[in-house]
From Swiss-Prot:
GO terms for molecular function: protoheme IX farnesyltransferase activity. The keyword Transmembrane applies. It comes from Pseudomonas syringae pv. tomato (strain ATCC BAA-871 / DC3000). The gene is cyoE. Keywords: Cell inner membrane, Cell membrane, Heme biosynthesis, Membrane, Transferase, Transmembrane, Transmembrane helix. GO terms for biological process: heme O biosynthetic process. Carbon 2 of the heme B porphyrin ring is defined according to the Fischer nomenclature. It is an enzyme of class 2 (transferase). Pathway: Porphyrin-containing compound metabolism; heme O biosynthesis; heme O from protoheme: step 1/1. This is Protoheme IX farnesyltransferase. NCBIfam families: cyoE_ctaB (TIGR01473), PRK04375.1-1 (NF003348). Its EC number is 2.5.1.141. It catalyses: heme b + (2E,6E)-farnesyl diphosphate + H2O = Fe(II)-heme o + diphosphate. The chain crosses the membrane at residues 9-29, 36-56, 80-100, 108-128, 135-155, 163-183, 209-229, 230-250, 265-285.
Length: 295
C-alpha cells in the first residue's frame, strides 16, 4: 500500500477530463469577470467528489474488474488497499468536496455535485450497470454534471445555458461510451455487463451512435443560439460535430469495427476538449457588461 495506490483508485484521467469541463462551464458563466478563489473551489471540490465516486465504483466493481482484461490489475482487485480503507477514503473525499463547493462556491453547485454522485454511485454503479442496457444513458447524466457545477458556481442559477450544458455533455457521453464498449466488446461480454453492443449487436449500436452525435451537434449550437457563446465557438462546434458525425457514418462501411471505434473514441475526446476551451474564451458579453467595461 502506497500513495500511488490511493491516487490510482481515484482514476486521475477521469478527474482531469472533468476539470476541463468544470473550467468550461465556469468561464462561460464568468464572461471574463473571473473570481479565481471560486474557480479553485469549483475545480478542487468537483475533483474531490468525482474522485470519491471513482473510488466507490472501484469498490463496487471488484468482481467485474476481475473478469476484464484491462481492469484485472486494479488496486482493489489485487488487494493492495483494503476495502474498508478504500470506503473510508471515498467517504472523506466526497464529504470534503461537497463541503468545499457549499462553503466556497454556493449550495446550488454543491447540490449538482451530490446529484451527480448519487446517479453515478447509487443508480449506475450499484444497480443499472449490471442489470440494464439503459445504464449508460442514466450514467451519462452524472458525467454531465461537472460543467453544470462550474457554471452554477458562478451564476448560482440553473438557466438555459446550464440546461444546454447538461444536455450537451449527456449526449456526448453516449457515443463516447458506446465506442469504448465496441472496442472492449470481449471484456464487457466476459464480465456480463449488458451494454448495447453486447445486448443488441454492433450494427444497432452504430445507429445509436449516429443519432446521438447528431443530437449532440444540435445541442452544442444552442449555446450560440441562446446568446451565451460566440461565432468562433459556433464554428468549432459545427466543424468538430460534423466531422464526428462523418466518422460515425463511416462506421457502416468499416472493415475493422475495433479500429473504427477507437478512432471515434479518440476524436470524441478532442471534440469535448475543444468545445470546453472555446466556451471558455468565446463567451458572449451582455450589453450591460459592455457598458460597464467601457466606463
Amino acid at each position: 500500500m502506497s500513495l500511488k495506490h490511493f491516487i490510482q483508485i481515484t482514476k486521475p484521467g477521469i478527474i482531469f477530463g472533468n476539470v476541463l469541463s468544470v473550467a468550461g462551464g465556469f468561464f462561460l458563466a464568468s464572461k471574463g469577470n473571473i473570481d479565481f478563489g471560486v474557480f479553485l473551489a469549483a475545480v478542487i471540490g468537483t475533483s474531490l467528489v468525482v474522485a470519491s465516486g471513482c473510488v466507490f465504483n472501484n469498490c463496487i466493481d471488484r468482481d467485474i474488474d476481475q473478469r476484464m482484461e484491462r481492469t484485472r490489475n486494479r488496486v482493489l482487485v489485487q488487494g493492495l488497499v483494503s476495502l474498508k480503507l478504500a470506503l473510508l477514503y471515498a467517504t472523506l473525499l466526497g464529504i470534503a468536496g461537497v463541503a468545499l463547493l457549499y462553503t466556497e462556491a454556493n449550495p446550488l453547485a454543491a447540490l449538482f455535485a451530490v446529484i451527480g454522485f448519487v446517479i453515478y454511485v447509487g443508480f449506475y454503479s450499484l444497480y443499472l450497470k449490471r442489470r440494464s442496457v439503459h445504464g449508460t444513458l442514466v450514467g451519462s447524466l452524472s458525467g454531465a454534471m461537472p460543467p453544470v457545477i462550474g457554471y452554477c458556481a458562478v451564476s448560482n442559477s440553473f438557466d438555459f445555458a446550464a440546461l444546454t450544458l447538461l444536455v450537451m455533455f449527456s449526449l456526448w457521453q453516449m457515443p463516447h461510451s458506446y465506442a469504448i464498449a465496441i472496442f472492449r466488446f470481449n471484456d464487457y461480454r466476459a464480465a456480463k455487463i449488458p451494454v448495447l453492443p453486447v445486448q443488441r449487436g454492433i450494427l444497432v449500436t452504430k445507429r445509436h451512435i449516429l443519432l446521438y452525435i447528431l443530437a449532440f451537434l444540435v445541442a452544442t449550437l444552442m449555446l450560440t443560439v441562446g446568446g451565451y457563446a460566440g461565432l468562433n465557438y459556433l464554428a468549432v462546434a459545427a466543424g468538430m460535430g460534423m466531422y464526428w458525425l462523418y466518422m460515425a457514418w463511416k462506421g457502416y462501411k468499416a472493415v475493422d469495427d475495433t479500429v473504427w471505434a477507437r478512432k471515434l473514441f479518440v476524436f470524441s475526446i478532442f471534440t469535448i476538449t475543444a468545445l470546453s476551451v472555446m466556451m471558455s474564451v468565446d463567451f458572449q458579453v451582455t450589453k450591460e457588461l459592455l457598458v460597464t467595461y467601457a466606463f
